[in-house]
Regions:
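A structural signal for short, well-ordered beta-strand segments and their strand-loop junctions
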Residues: 37-42, 109, 198-199
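Substrate-engagement module of ASCE P-loop NTPases
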Residues: 14-36
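Phosphate/oxyanion-binding active-site loops and adjacent basic polyanion-contact surfaces
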Residues: 13-21, 75, 184-187
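Amphipathic alpha-helical segments of the small helical/lid subdomains adjacent to P-loop NTPase cores
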Residues: 48-53, 61-120, 157, 162
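Extended alpha-helical interface modules used as scaffolds for assembling large macromolecular complexes
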Residues: 58-59, 110-218
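Short, small-residue-biased leader/transition segments that mark boundaries at the very start
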Residues: 2-9
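A short beta-strand-to-loop transition that corresponds to the Sensor-1 phosphate-sensing loop
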Residues: 32-48, 54-56
Length: 218
């Protein structure tokens, strides 16, 4: 998820990479007569990076938005149908416990990568236990650096999350990769946008209630 940008920052060619991507997108998205529209995905909003200089008509939809919220993952019904189609309906409870729990917009969804991998293994061995398919698919160096910098309060909040409690935080959706670990408060925005935490509602003053989504992440 963050692997490419972690390498850019670590090896100190971040500005050069931003310039390269800006030129690439300019050619591919603006001066391409054969392109009707483009759909781009990522963890963090990229508007502040200026990689879209010269382009317009963008619509940014984050995991906080309700539009297309069910398209960010599998719904309960979709997972039930998938399991049933392979004769694995009895494995729904553990699938839900391990891979459900994400709240995108107004929808509750599962991580597709995990569900697909678990069903694939169950199809050959119905005694297989759920496991962590997710962590090895991403780079976590930025998260580790932020946690290493954590003060006593932040570590206490992490412990509260691990035991199943919620914490309330203001999140920023305007971070850029090169400023992520400049402030320990950015930790919560990074954990949220990269899937380690999910939304459990809002407080009256607009803060987000955050929780660990499922057993896999714990």
């Amino acid at each position: 998820r963050l692997v490419g940008s972690e390498m850019c920052i670590r090896d100190r060619y971040y500005c050069e990479m931003v310039s390269l991507i800006r030129g690439l997108f300019g050619q591919a998205l603006k001066t391409n007569d054969y392109l009707q529209f483009a759909f781009l995905t990522g963890c963090l909003r990229v508007s502040k990076e200026s990689i879209f200089t010269g382009l317009n008509n963008f619509k940014v939809l984050s995991i906080m938005d309700s539009r297309f919220d069910e398209q960010f993952g599998f719904t309960d019904d979709e997972v039930k149908k998938l399991l049933a189609s392979y004769g694995l309906a009895s494995h729904f409870p553990e699938t839900k416990e391990w891979y459900d729990g994400y709240h995108f917009g107004n929808a509750d969804v599962y991580c597709p990568w995990d569900v697909i991998n678990y069903v694939d293994e169950l199809n050959y061995d119905q005694t297989v236990e759920p496991q962590d398919y997710w962590s090895n698919s991403s780079g976590n160096a930025i998260v580790r650096r932020l946690i290493d910098k954590a003060d006593v309060q932040t570590k206490d909040e992490i412990e509260r999350l691990i035991v199943g409690e919620c914490i309330e935080k203001e999140l920023s959706q305007e971070l850029t990769y090169d400023e992520l670990d400049k402030n320990i408060g950015n930790l919560w925005s990074v954990l949220f946008t990269t899937g380690y935490l999910t939304k459990q509602g809002r407080t009256a003053d607009g803060k987000i209630r955050l929780a660990i989504p499922n057993k896999e992440i714990k």
